[in-house]
Amino acid sequence: MTSRLRALGGRINNTRTSELPKEKTRSEVICSIRFLDGLVQTFKVNKQDLGQSLLDMAYGHLGVTEKEYFGLQHGDDPVDSPRWLEASKPLRKQLKGGFPCTLHFRVRYFIPDPNTLQQEQTRHLYFLQLKMDVCEGRLTCPLNSAVVLASYAVQSHFGDFNSSIHHPGYLADSQFIPDQNDDFLSKVESLHEQHSGLKQSEAESCYINIARTLDFYGVELHGGRDLHNLDLMIGIASAGIAVYRKYICTSFYPWVNILKISFKRKKFFIHQRQKQAESREHIVAFNMLNYRSCKNLWKSCVEHHSFFQAKKLLPQEKNVLSQYWTLGSRNPKKSVNNQYCKKVIGGMVWNPVMRRSLSVERLETKSLPSRSPPITPNWRSPRLRHEIRKPRHSSADNLANEMTYITETEDVFYTYKGPLSPKDSDSEVSQNHSPHRESLSENNPAQSCLTQKSSSSVSPSSNAPGSCSPDGVDQRFLEDYHKVTKGGFVEDASQYYCDKSDDGDGYLVLIRITPDEEGRFGFNLKGGVDQKMPLVVSRINPESPADTCMPKLNEGDQIVLINGRDISEHTHDQVVMFIKASRESHSRELALVIRRKAVRSLAEIRSEDELSQLFPEAMFPACPEGGDSLEGSMELLKKGLESGTVLIQFEQLYRKKPGLAVSFAKLPQNLDKNRYKDVLPYDTTRVLLQGNEDYINASYVNMEMPAANLVNKYIATQGPLPNTCAQFWQVVWDQKLSLVVMLTTLTERGRTKCHQYWPDPPDIMDHGIFHIQCQTEDCTIAYVSREMLVTNTETGEEHTVTHLQYVAWPDHGVPDDSSDFLEFVKYVRSLRVDGEPALVHCSAGIGRTGVLVTMETAMCLIERNLPVYPLDIVRKMRDQRAMMVQTSSQYKFVCEAILRVYEEGLVQRLDPS
């Protein structure tokens, strides 16, 4: 028997029981933990204990309640291969470097929006970690951003500036960035004075909100090499895996595009979802320094994915959602639900059959509603600028709020990727994003009667991409649906715009219903994924809210979205639960997007109001009757905003003018000069550069106003890329432009929106044959004004340019108030030079750019007492550059701003004589 055990690798344990306590005593060791405040605490542990015991000691020492964000990092590991203490593994197998040992308490998972953290202590620890990372150079940032960050750190530590205590040089012993100098500290001291009144927690929140806009926020970097042995960094972020060369992101692989990650010896593999018309799996490979670092990277990827996927789910929804996600992990405890997880040797598997993939030719990103502050040294700090949202507590009684929470914290990182040379191994992939399925599982009758009273409004009933967002409905409500079904492009959210017609028959209508006093909506449903049939309205109770709303809900209408939620994969009972949950929201409204197969006969339409809703007279307006005066056009605009018809008209308008080619933009040598692959200039209106390379993604947009004998000229262009800055300044030089208007920050929530094509004052930056010097920089609460000197190094000629950067546009959607924007437009008008184009850009050069052109054109017309038709303005713009004014929310914003300018007299009328 003994020999048999030895043959199998076993051995007989003859250890006496009396020896066990002595063994345990000898295994006690000392571990030191360095916390984020710099203090070191020693703990006595047993080597046989699991890592969780030491983690619990660290958590208990600080009194941390949100423990999931933090971990213990090994202190002796290289910077480019961080290793974390595993909770489920014995300490003796992890701490092999001898005792006593030192570990570092650190934030491991940085969520996209730290404002949603529940505990102030957690936010304080985030602040300490970010401050340390900036100070030690792990989190790089521009000098101007570093000044602002340091000023908030000073406010947190010293409190309000006091001239009697804080004498010049009081920060001499403070360290904020690796290579700071006296000039840097003097700027910090100056800015500290502006933060008077901010509490410590508020200053720290401001610090976090700026830090989270930096490119490397929340990115865990691992060193590696490509297949040609060239150095690169692999970063693990909340939404996927990024590849950096010389600290520039060259590729990004979202989790939704990754089927499996694996490793073999020193090679790390990313298995991507197949593209359309591809029969083979697409695999990207990297070389790591050694087997340990390769396994370490793989493990960290698995744990990051598991953590951030779980954070997207409400606790009540995890069990249901696990049906749609199949995740494999070496540690099943890390995944959402153990029974639905596969264990895969050396890899993580997603089951593509269990999820509905969107178009693989698209990349979507979502931004948070909070604003990204600009990176300028004179940025003001008052609370009104930093709209720090209160953390929301998850509650099953308020499903609507939880749905918003999930949407807002969902993040997909995006950085422009130009085509790499053939020697680069991490090739660009097409990327997509599938919404996760959210549901509550409760027992409800197979058919339920639901009712409601009051009003609703119509939504776009067209096949054009995009959506109508009437007042009171979340702006993401229809936009997300059209992005899912039609590939609709949103400037702040997508790399592609795909103009696809809807696959289904009929047209879409948005219906809003408010329940009656008893909480009933008044209609029955049949169908669901469990019944293997679409969800259809089977019965409408007479005189119920569903029957009296306009447009009314009809029997046979197919339910597509409920409060912005795609219900195509949900059971009947789950859908009923979603509808009931809407009664608990603040507005109590139920917003349904339904597909209606055919328009009812006129005999079925009971009122003229309903007829005008379904067939608005101004669906294809020319010059509406009574609208040939300014007053008449403003009255029509006001009524259109109230009824929602202006948004329907906007959705009916073509996004690209039929028949206009974009062939030059698609030439092979020009492809990498386009930030977005479907936002391209028409051949007929594109700006031609002087010289051999004549292409830039820019269009001439001339807004002619014959009745005013006026033409406003623009050059609308995308935000420059690192490889197009020289062409950008070539346009400025060729056209002798004196005004450049920028409508975005450089990054919004860590995503690059525009490359910085100008230097910080008073530095000089070279782009091609041009020297650019920023001579002055003046910051206000809404915009930054710069004076730049452009010098042609070949001729020695100089040209002065005014650069205006609007920084108050929120990361998501549109501004809540138009005051700042209107002041900015008025300032732009004051700097215009007669007959000279103004160069305007945002990120794609169509959304916010179109809003500004529309607003300035409308102001000119109001000033001259001429009628204003916003849709005609948009049509004229789209005849010259596709997709100008990009979303319904942008169009609604500019229409409301135009009406406000008229009603409040914000523009001085010119004397008709």
Curated annotation (Swiss-Prot):
This is Tyrosine-protein phosphatase non-receptor type 3. Substrate binds at D811, C842, S843, A844, G845, I846, G847, R848, Q886. Residues 510-582 form the PDZ domain. It comes from the Eukaryota. Residues 454-470 have a biased composition (Low complexity). The keyword tRNA processing does not apply. GO terms for biological process: negative regulation of membrane protein ectodomain proteolysis; negative regulation of mitotic cell cycle; regulation of membrane depolarization during action potential; regulation of sodium ion transmembrane transport. May act at junctions between the membrane and the cytoskeleton. One of its GO terms (molecular function) is phosphotyrosine residue binding. It catalyses: O-phospho-L-tyrosyl-[protein] + H2O = L-tyrosyl-[protein] + phosphate. PROSITE patterns: FERM_2, FERM_3, PDZ, TYR_PHOSPHATASE_1, TYR_PHOSPHATASE_2, TYR_PHOSPHATASE_PTP. Residues 646-901 form the Tyrosine-protein phosphatase domain.
